[in-house]
């Protein structure tokens, strides 16, 4: 198993910027000293995910996951610790030497995880073979010529790892079998098909192959395109598998992530060739859905990275309909700012770039975007005879309903003027009609609010409460916490952040244990961490803790706000609070026992328990809690 020197791990951890790394996966906004965004580990519409650049940690107050930059990538991308250190170093452009093992050991993984890891490995190997066949063999010559004639450079073929599946039944079957791969598993992965006689054969034959990656950049599927005949579907995609769900996958999303984040917008296209041509033309933030309409899962994925989308679909009727559906989803579900780039009729982005050139496409891309409202007003014209008065009135009413949805008065004025000019109406007349539309729109929103489901009671614990103690940075919803919980938090946080504090508190605690088991477990980890001679560093401490729940507890503690100055008097107060709570809990247990003995007329035990309660009351009243 590969190991990395401790000093290299420390260098990467200390020099990496957690905001920059996580920002490649989550759209982060600055709030006070920290950054917040939608958690990538559970579905949510209100941000509860917080990243601290000062402490170099993340924590989600919704699902409880937390950690440092390494644990984020381990959780999000399914990496080993060594792989996560390597990826952080690469993403941070750090010049450190980290070697990864050639093959990942999956023997200790659960069966399901082990099988999916092997499926991914099979796809990686298969993609390399397909690409080699296209670029280096005689069998790939026709496909290579076809791609070059379409204007694709060899550089793009390599960037996108495009390949060719020859017209044989056993190219991939034999290739995988020679490497000891399970052919039944390869079938379940969508690489092979089973014939009626039970023999496994290649699923893809005589097709140009486009690898499909997940949001971790791993190849998990293929789309094969016919190029020299018409005896089958133009595109053949991998079936749904344990590693591939087309409702959740956008072509080129992982590779475009950095450009999307930098430009603060994403470009949606329909086809693989459109995305590849756009990349070659310099538009690097383009993605495409996998032969399906944009889904809610796609929309949520986009929302996590940006608030703006440019839809650049085909210029035919089907493309316009698809743009309307996609834009409606993004606006109504995710509240994105949507623009539409309409190409000439019958042209897709790939056609346009090949016919007009990259520079013309970039010019159109930057200068001819339609706002979502402008596109919808244009869309509402379709199949309407605007020479007919009834059709005109219906069209104007529909347009006013769209204009009524706009928040900005300037925008409303602009579109009203356009309508007034086109139909020779006064803008005052349209404004009167618009006011009625606004009233109707407000009534609709009020009715919708009456029908909203009640807030789940389980969420109320996270809601701000009157008189709540603000223990956390304001990114976390305020909670009213008990004194003993506050004490445990402050003691553990103080110990993690200072070896001197650890030694002092350990001495003051003596035989006293933490009330909550997870704090007691974390305390045990901390004792071992300092016993190994490590310095106080919560982010480094996280790496020594194998349990994900413990990492989440550490990150939550690091979000706790502590008093400016804490020393022995404060620590003694916290420990007294902890001891008092334990005695109070013991008293409650004895009172329950007393009630039981009283019902059972067990006088002997009743007297014994009463004496114990009297003794506890004396301790609590005197302050002698030991």
From Swiss-Prot:
Q: Name one GO cellular component term.
A: cytoplasm
Protein family per UniProt:
Belongs to the DnaG primase family.
Q: How does it assemble?
A: Monomer. Interacts with DnaB.
Give me any GO biological process, just one.
DNA replication, synthesis of primer
What is this enzyme's EC?
A: 2.7.7.101
Q: Which residues bind Mg(2+) 2?
A: 314, 316
Q: What does this protein do?
A: RNA polymerase that catalyzes the synthesis of short RNA molecules used as primers for DNA polymerase during DNA replication.
Query: Cofactor comment in the record?
Result: Binds 1 zinc ion per monomer.
Q: Which Pfam families match?
A: DnaB_bind, DNAG_N, Toprim_2, Zn_ribbon_DnaG
The segments annotated as CHC2-type zinc fingers are 39-63
Residue stretches making up the Toprim domain: 264-346
The record ties this protein, via InterPro entries, to:
DNA_helicase_N/primase_C (IPR016136), DNA_primase_core_N_sf (IPR037068), DNA_primase_DnaB-bd (IPR019475), DNA_primase_DnaG (IPR006295), DNA_primase_Znf_CHC2 (IPR036977), DnaG_bac (IPR030846), DNAG_N (IPR013264), DnaG_primase (IPR050219)
Record-level Gene Ontology MF annotations: DNA binding; DNA-directed RNA polymerase activity; zinc ion binding
Substrates-to-products reaction catalysed: ssDNA + n NTP = ssDNA/pppN(pN)n-1 hybrid + (n-1) diphosphate
Q: Where does Mg(2+) 1 bind?
A: 270, 314
- EC main class here is transferase
Domain comment? Answer: Contains an N-terminal zinc-binding domain, a central core domain that contains the primase activity, and a C-terminal DnaB-binding domain.
- Which keywords does the record carry? DNA replication, DNA-binding, DNA-directed RNA polymerase, Magnesium, Metal-binding, Nucleotidyltransferase, Primosome, Transcription, Transferase, Zinc, Zinc-finger
Q: What is this protein called?
A: DNA primase
* Cross-referenced HAMAP family: DNA_primase_DnaG (MF_00974)
Chain segments annotated as transmembrane: none
Domain of life, source organism: Bacteria
Cofactor(s) recorded for this entry are:
Zn(2+); Mg(2+)
Where does this protein come from, organism-wise? Listeria monocytogenes serovar 1/2a (strain ATCC BAA-679 / EGD-e)
The gene behind this protein is dnaG
- Check the record and name the SUPFAM superfamilies matching this protein: DNA primase core, Zinc beta-ribbon
């Amino acid at each position: 198993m590969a190991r990395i020197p401790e000093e290299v791990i420390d260098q990467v951890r200390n020099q990496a910027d957690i905001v920059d790394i996580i920002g490649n996966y989550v759209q982060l906004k600055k709030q006070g000293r920290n950054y917040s965004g939608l958690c990538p580990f559970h579905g949510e519409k209100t941000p509860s995910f917080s990243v601290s650049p000062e402490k170099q940690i993340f924590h989600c107050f919704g699902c409880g996951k937390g950690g440092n930059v390494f644990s984020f990538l381990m959780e999000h991308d399914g990496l080993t610790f060594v792989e996560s250190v390597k990826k952080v170093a690469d993403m941070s452009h750090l010049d450190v030497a980290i070697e990864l093992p050639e093959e990942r050991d999956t023997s200790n993984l659960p069966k399901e995880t082990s099988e999916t890891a092997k499926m991914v490995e099979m796809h990686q190997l298969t993609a390399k073979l397909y690409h080699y066949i296209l670029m280096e063999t005689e069998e790939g010559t026709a496909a290579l010529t076809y791609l070059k004639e379409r204007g694709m450079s060899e550089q793009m073929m390599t960037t996108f790892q495009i390949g060719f599946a020859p017209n044989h039944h056993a190219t991939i079957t034999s290739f995988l079998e020679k490497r000891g791969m399970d052919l039944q598993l390869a079938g379940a992965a969508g690489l092979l098909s089973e014939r009626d006689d039970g023999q496994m054969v290649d699923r893809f034959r005589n097709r140009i192959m486009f690898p499909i990656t997940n949001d971790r950049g791993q190849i998990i599927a293929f789309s094969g395109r016919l190029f020299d005949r018409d005896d089958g579907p133009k595109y053949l995609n991998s079936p749904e598998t344990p590693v591939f769900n087309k409702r959740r996958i956008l072509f080129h999303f992982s590779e475009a992530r950095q450009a999307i984040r930098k430009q603060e917008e994403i470009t949606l296209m329909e086809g693989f060739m459109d995305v590849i041509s756009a990349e070659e033309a310099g538009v690097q933030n383009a993605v495409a859905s996998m032969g399906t309409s944009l889904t809610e899962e796609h929309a949520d994925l986009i929302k996590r990275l940006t608030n703006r989308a440019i839809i650049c679909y085909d210029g035919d009727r089907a493309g316009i309909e698809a743009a309307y559906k996609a834009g409606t989803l993004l606006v109504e579900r995710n509240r994105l700012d949507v623009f539409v780039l309409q190409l000439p009729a019958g042209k897709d982005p790939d056609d346009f770039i090949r016919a007009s050139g990259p520079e013309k496409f970039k010019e159109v891309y930057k200068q001819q975007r339609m706002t979502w409202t402008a596109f919808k007003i244009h869309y509402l014209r379709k199949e309407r005879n605007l020479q007919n008065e009834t059709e005109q009135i219906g069209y104007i009413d529909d347009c006013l309903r769209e204009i009524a949805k706009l928040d900005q008065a300037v925008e409303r004025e602009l579109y009203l003027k356009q309508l007034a000019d086109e139909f020779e109406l006064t803008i005052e007349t349209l404004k009167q009609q618009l006011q009625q539309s606004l009233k109707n729109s407000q009534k609709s929103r009020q009715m919708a609010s009456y029908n909203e489901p009640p807030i789940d009671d389980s969420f109320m614990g996270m809601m701000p409460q009157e008189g709540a103690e603000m223990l956390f940075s304001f990114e976390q919803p305020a909670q009213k916490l008990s004194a003993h919980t506050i004490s445990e938090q402050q003691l553990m946080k103080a110990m993690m952040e200072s070896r001197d504090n650890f030694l002092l508190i350990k001495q003051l605690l003596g035989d006293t244990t933490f009330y909550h088991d997870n704090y007691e477990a974390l305390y045990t980890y901390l004792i071992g961490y300092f016993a190994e001679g490590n310095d106080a560093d919560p982010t480094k401490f996280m790496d020594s803790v194998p349990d994900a729940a413990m990492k989440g507890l550490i990150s939550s503690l690091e979000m706790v706000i502590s008093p400016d100055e804490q020393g022995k008097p404060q620590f003694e107060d916290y420990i007294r609070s902890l001891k008092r709570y334990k005695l109070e809990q013991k008293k409650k247990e004895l009172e329950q026992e007393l009630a039981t003995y009283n019902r059972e007329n067990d006088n002997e035990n009743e007297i014994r328990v009463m004496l114990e309660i009297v003794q506890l009351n004396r301790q609590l009243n005197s302050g002698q809690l030991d």
